[in-house]
Amino acid sequence: EMLASYGKESVYHAHIGTGELHVRPLINLKDAGEAKLLRTIAEETARIVKKYRGSMSGEHGDGRLRGEFIPLIIGAGNYKLNKRIKRVFDPNGILNPGKITDTPPMDSSLRYIPGKPTPEPATHYDFSDCGGVVRAAEKCNGSGDCRKSSVIGGLMCPSFMATGDERLTTRARANIMREMLYADRDNPWDSREIYEILDLCLACKGCRSECPSGVDIAKLKSEFLQHYNDVHPPSLRTRLIASLPKIYSLFSFIPGIFNFFATNKFTALIIKRVTGFAAERSIPVLAPQTFRRWLKKNLSALNPANPIGEICLFVDEFTNHNDLDAGKAAAKLLTGLGYRITFAGNAASARTYISKGFLRQAKKLITKNILVLGPLVSDDCPLVGIEPSAILGFRDEFPDLAGDKLRPEASRLAQHTFTLEEFIAGEFSAGRIKREMFTREPAEVLVHVHCQEKAITTSAPVLAALGIPVNYKVREIPSGCCGMAGAFGYEKEHFELAQKVGELVLFPDVRSASAGTIICAPGTSCRHHVKDGTGRVALHPAEVLLAALRG
């Protein structure tokens, strides 16, 4: 009623266990009048809380926001006792000054200066859903949910979990991005300090789903890197990683030569030193033939005569060149379950370009994929992908990078795009895939779900798909990001952090698994990290399910 009297609404969320209600009035603190209204509403809220003998803070601290209302809530006499206790234990006022006693007015250090215009820098991504890139960074409310340990679980934020460094939290990155974009200089994107802080972001996208405000640091990092690259020419290694699909395509006709140089101890060490890859890391090798060539040769024989459905298979660059076994397993699994597969001459997923901030090049690939795949994909023929980081770009970055003309088609395509595990779990739920199609033999499966898969789709489809065989016991490793994060863990300056992230939960769980336990990971870089970090071979879910398929 009080908020309504001022014409205001509020966002509410609560903790059942502590009986606490969070109230976030929708107030524009950039407006001088609204900023004054903040104090008025806070004062009236404090009086309401006092009236009903409640607490202003619940299980939270009072701090600078609520400290000035403590005398009202507990009474002047009790407040004087608090001040006496504070003086006894902290006579010089050096321990958290101004947080509970002698707190300054709650509106004396507001983040925004009322009346100061919000910058509107041009961007490559479409940030219109939150009012522009500056407001995307401003979404952070400082709650600190990103400051959690691996013991608590979840995905956000792996670099903080491994280091405990506040600078590497989602909160710190969002706020320093905000300050950078408000900076009064010709090019606010030209900041080495921002580059170094964002450099240790693994782009797991955990903040996209776990941050209460939905701050997407991976998206902000990608945008920043394009502007930074415009001023500071990227290194040879950065260009190589971004152009990896082209390099793979070039060597796909002579994979033996590529693999010799990649696996020979002497030549591999030279490559790593020249490019800046970690000496401890093994270089991914090329498959003897591409998945696309294999499909052209074998698909007609695999496709069922009387299919129960049809899918358009997205041939991503990682499956195409590196993970032929996973691709073959996916094709045999889907056709064995009764689905007809089609595939088109799609471009690469643009994942390497997006990760390294080459957004102009990424847009070209995105445009081609939309134009090529759009006419083929529908409710009756969904787009299904094998590598999570590649296929999920259709649902995440593609609509925001497609441009005004293609955005509607990109959004439509996103609605019909699924990971392999999502598709299989959905078809099982619909009754078109049945348990009887799979073995009754028992098996234990330990699975690490790809970080972007967890952030965008959740782990549930992976666990559901792997659990279709009736006697398969599936357990998810309670890990966040594996630590490899695409090319991140290959880079020499990031190797140690990648290992620390892996050692938080993933590596110990894999090492403790019995020799007969099936280790599973949908992500190509996750599987590589598990192999390098533990010596165990992790399989793609398609390989696990194909081995369980009857007939």
Predicted regions and their residues:
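Helical (often loop-to-helix) elements that flank the catalytic cores of nucleotide-handling enzymes
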Residues: 30-49, 74-85
